[in-house]
Regions:
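Short, low-complexity N-terminal regulatory "tails/caps" that precede and couple sensory modules
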Residues: 1-5
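Intrinsically disordered, low-complexity Ser/Thr- and Pro-rich stretches
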Residues: 6-7, 59
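Bateman (tandem CBS) regulatory domains
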Residues: 8-23, 71-83, 90, 139-146
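A diffuse structural propensity rather than consistent per-protein peaks
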Residues: 12-13, 30, 60, 74-75, ...
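The conserved cystathionine-beta-synthase
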Residues: 23-43, 49-52, 68, 84-112, ...
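Short hydrophobic beta-strand motif reused across regulatory alpha/beta modules
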Residues: 56-64, 116-124
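ATP/adenylate-binding site constellation spanning eukaryotic-like Ser/Thr protein kinases
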Residues: 61, 69-72, 80, 121
Length: 146
């Protein structure tokens, strides 16, 4: 019964998202704190939220390092506001077109744009292919290096 079901039409962003991900708080944290957060978690990008937990963009490890080198304490100028976001009920089949346009996670927000979680690209591929996460991460890394 279950073997012929198209998982992409059933599984939602909300069911595979990482809840309570590490974030960058726009007016509260500077580059130094964000660099430490990213290195501790072995990640290269953080969602940026405002004081109301609304998603306003993302910042990369590289951008934070440049700010630190320049001695700039605010992350404002390094925030990339064009990010992909979806709601929790978005089906994986609707996330697929987004993964070809970004190396960043897909952010999950509510109607008020409050950050609810994020979906790593590897999680989408794992759900679609049934391959394990290590195998997928290796494939993604090889593709990025091309």
């Amino acid at each position: 019964f279950v073997e012929n079901v198209d998982r992409s039409k059933i599984i939602t962003a909300g069911s595979i998202m990482i809840t309570r991900p590490a974030v960058a708080r726009l007016r509260k944290e500077g580059p130094e704190v964000l660099i430490r957060k990213m290195k501790e978690r072995d990640i290269t990008v953080l969602p940026v939220i405002d004081e109301n937990d609304k998603l306003i963009g993302e910042i990369t490890l590289e951008s934070a390092a440049i700010l630190r080198r320049k001695g700039i304490k605010s992350i404002q100028e390094a925030v990339q506001s064009e990010v992909h976001s979806v709601t929790e009920d978005t089906k994986i089949e609707d996330l697929l077109p987004l993964i070809t346009k970004t190396n960043s996670p897909i952010y999950v927000v509510n109607e008020e744009r409050e950050l609810k979680g994020l979906v790593p690209l590897s999680s989408i591929v794992v759900e679609m292919t049934g391959k394990d996460k290590e195998e997928i991460n290796e494939l993604i890394q090889n593709a990025i290096e091309l």
